[in-house]
Structure formats: structure tokens, C-alpha cells
């Protein structure tokens, strides 16, 4: 039987012409190509199901290059992306306590350790001082993967410290909100953070300093009922879910079916709840421009 040897492969006469190499043209081995493609970890877009490498999605600010879906962004990645230069991280001295000795299916300290291992963070809020387009500012971001971005005493401590430093330095405060609400494991102490953060925001406003909130997916509960809805300007990312109680809870309470876009950023924009929806790629310039106008900067 006649056989051909091309590029290290043994080809029989029965090999289809589509699989035969063309003289002068080198074709990469299919298995090697697939192996090279998947040597780097990939992320599947929840909207179009495209596989995108972590490097590519990170470079694109966690926006799917195929369908433009805004994927969830980790708090530290978001702040490092937002600032041109980070000066300092705030509130690292605060650590969670367990005064209620709370236990559900497991003790609260065990849940905290699991969240810290999962995210690499010590709490659900990260606050930083930095600059954007030449303007110094303070920004904080919720880490949703840390117990659903829930607000406990340390989240309140860090937010208040960020607001106080903003007043001291005469700088604007930006908050990227993403939370399921107050942290039930801390009971009334977590609910008190709604009042604490609201009071800190009022002091910021009394000082004549801007407070801009960026509502990312999702924002619910006590965070919505306090610091997330007290901004001078509310920006939402596309398709973000924003509300107090979730859609399912509301439907079970009122015994009615709610329309599909309910609580979506676009629906809330149409009803005057948020001021604008901004694509993530335009967010830095939008915030920079708003801060310059609100602070009468050149």
C-alpha cells in the first residue's frame, strides 16, 4: 500500500483531500492548536457562552469581547483598574468580631475563614486612596464573593474611615456597590452600619464634597437602603440588578408576577431611580468628568 509521509504524519490513499497538507503551506496540528488554546485558564461568558482567556477578559475590564456582557469584577481588580495610581489602602486594621457567637449551619468565624480563603480578602469592602486623570480621590468597592458583599461592622468601619479621610483631604468619595445587604450573622450590629454610613455621607455632603455611587450587579437589601442610594449622582452598569427585596420575594408577598425588566438598571433609568447607565469602558472618564464639574476643577 502506497503511503505518503508529510509533516511527520503517515497518510494513506484514503486520507480525505481536505486533510492533506498543501506544499509550501504549514498547517498547525489540530490537537496542538487546541492544547495551546486551553493552556491558559478560560472564563465562560454567562450570556453568549463564549470561552475567553483570563488574560483577555482582564485586559478588557471583564467585559465579554464577543457580546459586551459586563461580568462581575473583583473589588481589588476594580479599584486597581479604576485608579491611575493607588496611594494607600484604608482600614486594614479593622477585623471582624463575633460578639453574638452566631451559629447557623456553622459558626460565624468558620464562615469568615472560608470567605477569606475563597477571595484572598479580609472583608467584603476594600477602600483605597488614589488618583484618576490627575485628580486625587477616595474609592471603595464591595467584594461580592465575600459572603455576598454583606455589610457588617468592618464594612461600616472601612466606609466611615474612607468618608472621614475624604473630608480631611477635601477629596471626592466614589463607591462601587455590589451587595446582598446587611450581614445577618452580626444581627443588629450590621443594621447599625446603615445609620453609620448614612451619617458619614451626610458629613461628606455638609463639607461640600461629591459622593458618586456606581451600582454594579447586584445591589440589594440594607446596602441599597443606605449608602448605595445616597449619592449625589448614581451611575449604573448595564443590566445590573438593583433593588431592596429580590423579585421572587416581592412576587410571593404581593402574589403578582412582575414584568421581566423589573429591577434592571435600564428599567430603573426609565423610572428615574438612577441618573445614567455607563459602559464600563467609559466609566473612568465619566467619573473623572463628573468630579471635575462638581468640584469646579479645570
Swiss-Prot record:
Chief localization: cytoplasm
Single Gene Ontology BP annotation: malonyl-CoA biosynthetic process
ZnF (C4-type) residues: 45-67
Gene Ontology MF terms in the entry: acetyl-CoA carboxylase activity; ATP binding; carboxyl- or carbamoyltransferase activity; zinc ion binding
Ranges of residues in domain CoA carboxyltransferase N-terminal: 41-298
Xref: InterPro entries: AcCoA_carboxyl_beta, Acetyl_CoA_COase_Trfase_b_su, ClpP/crotonase-like_dom_sf, COA_CT_N
Keywords: ATP-binding, Cytoplasm, Fatty acid biosynthesis, Fatty acid metabolism, Lipid biosynthesis, Lipid metabolism, Metal-binding, Nucleotide-binding, Transferase, Zinc, Zinc-finger
Record pathway: Lipid metabolism; malonyl-CoA biosynthesis; malonyl-CoA from acetyl-CoA: step 1/1
Gene Ontology cellular component annotations, sorted alphabetically: acetate CoA-transferase complex
Catalysed transformations (reactions): N(6)-carboxybiotinyl-L-lysyl-[protein] + acetyl-CoA = N(6)-biotinyl-L-lysyl-[protein] + malonyl-CoA
Region feature (Disordered): 1-21
EC identifiers of the protein: 2.1.3.15
UniProt subcellular location: Cytoplasm
Cofactor: binding details: Binds 1 zinc ion per subunit.
Subunit annotation: Acetyl-CoA carboxylase is a heterohexamer composed of biotin carboxyl carrier protein (AccB), biotin carboxylase (AccC) and two subunits each of ACCase subunit alpha (AccA) and ACCase subunit beta (AccD).
Job of this protein: Component of the acetyl coenzyme A carboxylase (ACC) complex. Biotin carboxylase (BC) catalyzes the carboxylation of biotin on its carrier protein (BCCP) and then the CO(2) group is transferred by the transcarboxylase to acetyl-CoA to form malonyl-CoA.
HAMAP family: AcetylCoA_CT_beta (MF_01395)
The family this protein is said to belong to: Belongs to the AccD/PCCB family.
Protein name: Acetyl-coenzyme A carboxylase carboxyl transferase subunit beta
Lineage, broadest ranks: Bacteria, Pseudomonadati, Pseudomonadota, Gammaproteobacteria, Moraxellales
Amino acid at each position: 500500500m502506497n503511503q505518503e509521509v508529510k509533516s511527520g504524519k503517515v497518510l494513506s490513499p484514503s486520507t480525505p483531500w481536505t486533510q492533506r497538507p498543501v506544499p509550501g503551506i504549514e498547517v498547525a496540528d489540530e490537537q496542538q492548536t487546541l492544547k495551546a488554546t486551553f493552556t491558559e485558564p478560560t472564563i465562560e461568558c454567562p450570556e453568549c457562552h463564549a470561552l475567553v482567556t483570563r488574560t483577555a477578559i482582564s485586559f478588557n475590564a471583564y467585559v465579554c469581547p464577543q457580546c459586551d456582557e459586563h461580568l462581575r469584577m473583583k473589588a481589588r481588580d476594580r479599584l486597581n483598574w479604576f485608579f491611575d495610581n493607588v496611594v494607600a489602602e484604608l482600614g486594614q486594621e479593622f477585623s471582624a468580631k463575633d460578639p453574638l457567637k452566631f451559629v447557623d449551619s456553622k459558626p460565624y468565624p468558620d464562615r469568615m475563614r472560608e470567605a477569606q480563603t475563597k477571595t484572598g480578602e479580609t472583608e467584603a469592602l476594600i477602600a483605597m486612596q488614589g488618583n484618576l486623570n490627575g485628580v486625587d480621590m477616595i474609592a471603595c468597592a464591595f467584594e461580592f464573593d465575600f459572603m455576598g458583599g454583606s455589610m457588617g461592622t468592618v464594612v461600616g468601619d472601612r466606609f466611615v474611615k474612607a468618608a472621614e479621610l475624604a473630608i480631611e483631604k477635601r477629596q471626592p468619595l466614589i463607591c462601587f456597590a455590589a451587595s446582598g445587604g446587611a450581614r445577618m450573622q452580626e444581627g443588629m450590629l450590621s443594621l447599625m452600619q446603615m445609620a453609620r454610613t448614612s451619617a458619614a455621607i451626610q458629613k461628606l455632603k455638609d463639607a461640600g464634597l461629591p459622593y458618586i455611587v456606581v451600582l454594579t450587579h447586584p445591589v440589594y437589601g440594607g446596602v441599597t437602603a443606605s449608602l448605595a442610594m445616597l449619592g449625589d449622582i448614581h451611575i449604573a452598569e448595564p443590566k445590573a440588578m438593583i433593588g431592596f427585596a429580590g423579585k421572587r420575594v416581592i412576587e410571593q408577598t404581593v402574589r403578582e408576577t412582575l414584568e421581566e425588566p423589573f429591577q434592571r438598571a435600564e428599567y430603573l433609568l426609565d423610572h428615574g431611580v438612577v441618573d445614567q447607565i455607563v459602559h464600563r469602558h467609559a466609566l473612568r472618564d465619566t467619573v473623572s468628568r463628573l468630579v471635575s464639574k462638581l468640584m469646579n476643577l479645570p
